[in-house]
Design a protein with these regions (language model features):
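DNA-binding alpha-helical recognition surfaces that contact promoter or target DNA
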Residues: 19, 23, 36, 47, ...
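Residues in the helix-turn-helix
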Residues: 44, 54, 73
Length: 83
């Protein structure tokens, strides 16, 4: 893990992010199928869902597109603040 990734993971609750990713996946998709949709393998998706890895910006954007949830919500569980 790079220094930047370590700093980010220290400030974010990776387990909570993982729970939100699992919520986005829902019960109708397997990790294999959802991973394919995101362009990643089942092992990497599992690491995200278990809070063992920080999702890349590319994956966050794909999750946002798929779920129509904000990246703020995916990372923090909060709605984005209005400008």
């Amino acid at each position: 893990m790079t220094t930047t990734a370590k700093n980010i993971s220290a400030r974010l609750d990776l387990k909570a992010i993982g729970r939100r990713i699992r919520e986005i996946r829902g019960f109708d998709l397997t990790q294999v199928d959802f991973g394919r949709m995101l362009g990643i393998g089942q092992t990497q998706l599992s690491k995200y869902e278990l809070g063992q890895s920080v999702p890349t910006v590319q994956i966050l954007l794909r999750l946002k597109t798929y779920s129509r949830k904000s990246i703020d919500w995916i990372l923090t569980g909060e709605k984005p603040q209005a400008d």
